[in-house]
Amino acid sequence: NMPYQTIDSGLFYQKIIDKLKQNTNICFFKNINEVNTENSYIFNSVSNAADSKNNLWQHFSGVEIETIKNSFDDEIFNLMDFDCDQKNSVHFFYTLPYSKTKALIETTWISDLNSASLIDYDNQLKNYIENKLRIKNYKIIFKETGAIPLFHPKNIKKLNQVEIGTAGGMTRLSTGYTFSNIQEQSKYIRKNIENIKNTKIF
């Protein structure tokens, strides 16, 4: 069995960027309006899913909190606590302790994105922390919010463009997990980069 793990995205991205910057043939550009694809390839991670609010999404918001007193069992995490208001959807809370006084707590929904009451994340988290976990004194260190499409976005195939990540169908639709699949896809692309147009990606 593999232990459940969490990765600090900021540290992960910085490690990768620092590694890439060691290569003199790699350049970083921002705010590019036009890209010439005639003699190059584009690896695109931006999907067309944003306009599909009526489809099924896993959307969430989480806070990393720190408490004054010992409030968590740092050897046990609660992956899905369904003892909460479902509002005719699927709703659960997630608690991942880092120590006895620090934890990440998330509210997660599986639904469309049309209901304002479902995305009232701040009140959901406040009520859960104070009423369910019975923690009154805490401070928020970090906050995150996101939405993962539980459907494959229908991107229009373009010449010399490879869809990667969620845009490339790497999200596991049953769970929303994507990270491991992205690593495998990246390895495949790297292995076949010299002959990428003849691979099964196209």
Predicted regions and their residues:
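Short FAD-binding loop at a beta-strand-to-alpha-helix junction that anchors the flavin cofactor
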Residues: 95, 100-102, 158-174
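Aromatic-anchored, charged helix-turn/loop surface patch used as a conserved interaction hotspot
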Residues: 57, 173-177
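An active-site-proximal "capping" alpha-helix that borders the catalytic cofactor pocket
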Residues: 125-130, 178-196
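Active-site-proximal substrate-binding core of FAD-dependent oxidoreductases
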Residues: 140, 150-154, 187-202
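Catalytic cores of enzymes that engage adenine nucleotides and/or redox cofactors via long glycine-rich
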Residues: 141-148, 166
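Short histidine-centered catalytic/ligand-binding loop motif
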Residues: 2-5, 109-115, 175
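Predominantly flavin-linked oxidoreductase catalytic cores and closely associated redox partners
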Residues: 14-139, 149-157
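Dinucleotide-binding Rossmann-like beta1-alpha1 core, especially the glycine-rich loop
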Residues: 1-19
